[in-house]
Amino acid sequence: MLKKLIMFTGLLGGSVLFSGQALAAADFGPCTPEGGTHIFSATINKTVSDTSKNTTGATFVDFDSWNLGGTYAMSCECPDDTSLINDTLFKAVVPLAFVTNIESRSYYQINNNIAIASDVLISGGRGEYVNTPFENVGNLTNNRSQCSQNASSKDAIWTSGGKGHLSLYILHPFVGESIIPSTKIMDLFVTKKPSVYGSIPASSVYISGSITVPQGCELSSGSTLEIPFGEFKATDFKDRKGQVAKNATKFTKELQFKCTNISDGVKIFLRIEGMPNANDSNAIDMGNPDIGAVIEGANGKILVPNDASVNQELSVSGLVDDTHRTASTTISAYPISTTGKLPAAGDFEGIATMRIDVE
């Protein structure tokens, strides 16, 4: 009984070994990287400039990219018959939780706030960026240069995985930085036979860094606010240094701002920046040395241009949606004489910038 068992085991082992040798010599198969998987690590540090899009479901196509350089070598299973050639095929696997598919891009979760979609450059004869995940995408180079039978296969330069793009999807609106720890976003496998891939990726791509959504407010009525003072006689300014021009009116404007990413308890202040009059630093220059414009806050105090210590606190509403609030205040403006002299006749105008500070 013992002798028969030994003979049976020997025959079975020989049969399996023979079958494996025949398969390797007769067909194409997967490609294996020399020295293990090549790692590409990209750093992402980007800011969402349009904060109005900090909403659930918003997408930013080609939000960032990577171009890392670096090469690696591979050898592929090929038949011994050198007349047989085949394309080199790629498969990209994304090891993250799937979120959604939008316009042929598949988005995968990075953290609680964001998801990303990626594409990667398949070089060779294709030279195109392909959205991940995918399988059996050829590089359109039908040859045997990667075959393990060729000593030169280890000299072939491979770069796939080194270049690509990232698209961003907002899962939940957020304030400030969303940190991305080192996260694998794809494994790239290679083969010479469709759907027959090895277990070792040729390359893997990792990303890390942060995405920032800044806080801010913008004027609801647009980017500019015009205050027309009207027409005056030159004598309206004479002998009135530092005073409102005769017959002038204080123009009061109510300001409404749309603010993004302002947390509960945060205070918002308005201050003025601009070119001050050379003869009176409390006034905005109007292009005439004898005339300036003064801007007051709602409390009647002058908002001195370029003085950060002089500001007007805004009234801030509760949240109107997930990320937005409104803020409001009033300002008054009027022309003054800065010298008491009779100004030259002509048109005069000035420009001031309203600066918002968040504390």
UniProtKB/Swiss-Prot annotation:
Entry keywords, A to Z: Fimbrium, Signal
GO cellular component terms, A-Z: pilus
Subcellular location: Fimbrium
Principal subcellular localisation of the protein: other
Presence of keyword Signal: yes
Homology family: Belongs to the fimbrial protein family.
Name of this protein: Protein LpfD
Organism field: Salmonella typhimurium (strain LT2 / SGSC1412 / ATCC 700720)
